[in-house]
């Protein structure tokens, strides 16, 4: 993997990420494709209509169903899903914790029960890499010990030491495997305790292909989250991509870009779409509301997305009310277009040294009215 830092505007960064299957311009938003697809969309929607170059798939879910060996036999995630871009896969640790009532944390890994059939499984740092090798992920995340917030200081210290130990073990194994097309990212933990974040960075080897700021958006306030990012991002290697996991709103993303973050993922655009909430530059609208029943205009005037160029709010209102499956596709295409355009415009602003004014103008407009 090659990461080229092209421009900075104060702390905001614009770069190019060269992966085995694509070249990705940063800042980048990665649509979430948990089961190997973005919910309600296929690979053609992702790559040709949205122009997405990098999407996230979930190691936990692909391991349990259909199984990483099946995906490997079928040519890896790219061939299986017919997606010509790149995949980032997370380690599955978060899902093991959040989806199972019976999780046991051990020094060598995480024991959990499948949310599908109750069968017992062990994720170790090596096991999750082997799964991701079978998936042939462009970017693989190490197994980490995630802590919900608030958390006692002792638990945070345990988490960062265990996460760093697992990360460094993963890096040693990855070097032995000699798989240059599968890049390995470390994850920095420590909650909102800044000293713990510094310690986590210090304990983590500097030889990873990229670094993620994990363990945020799990119960802390927005101010605490931003303070943690502002503290942590400058501690990470400047020549490696920085990934903020699972965040978030348009405001969160712009704030994090201004603090030096390059990569983002979140289920918000697609989940909100399925639940009738659509993003516009003037804020969010709820398409299920009665005023849209006879509204013959697109979701947003001047929006170039597939949906806005073809369909009215009235049609989307009808599809949602009728519980038609097509609604989820059209709404998701719009919301993902909004997010992808947001980071694209942020990138252009960084290249032109006007990011702060771009951010200010966007937020003023976005908060100007509610629908």
From Swiss-Prot:
Keyword list, A-Z: Glycosyltransferase, Metal-binding, Queuosine biosynthesis, Transferase, tRNA processing, Zinc
UniProt-listed InterPro entries: TGT, TGT-like_sf, tRNA_ribo_trans-like
Cofactor or coenzyme needed: Zn(2+)
Functional note: Catalyzes the base-exchange of a guanine (G) residue with the queuine precursor 7-aminomethyl-7-deazaguanine (PreQ1) at position 34 (anticodon wobble position) in tRNAs with GU(N) anticodons (tRNA-Asp, -Asn, -His and -Tyr). Catalysis occurs through a double-displacement mechanism. The nucleophile active site attacks the C1' of nucleotide 34 to detach the guanine base from the RNA, forming a covalent enzyme-RNA intermediate. The proton acceptor active site deprotonates the incoming PreQ1, allowing a nucleophilic attack on the C1' of the ribose to form the product.
Quaternary structure (record): Homodimer. Within each dimer, one monomer is responsible for RNA recognition and catalysis, while the other monomer binds to the replacement base PreQ1.
Family, similarity comment: Belongs to the queuine tRNA-ribosyltransferase family.
HAMAP family linked to this entry: Q_tRNA_Tgt
Class in the EC hierarchy, top level: transferase
Catalytic reaction annotation: 7-aminomethyl-7-carbaguanine + guanosine(34) in tRNA = 7-aminomethyl-7-carbaguanosine(34) in tRNA + guanine
A GO molecular function held by the record: tRNA-guanosine(34) queuine transglycosylase activity
Protein name according to UniProt: Queuine tRNA-ribosyltransferase
Organism: Helicobacter pylori (strain P12)
Sequence segments annotated as region (RNA binding): 246-252, 270-274
Active site: 90, 265
One annotated Gene Ontology cellular component of this protein: cytosol
Co-factor binding details: Binds 1 zinc ion per subunit.
Annotated binding of Zn(2+), by residue: 303, 305, 308, 334
A Pfam entry, by short name: TGT
Residues annotated for substrate binding in this entry: 90-94, 144, 189, 215
EC number from the UniProt entry: 2.4.2.29
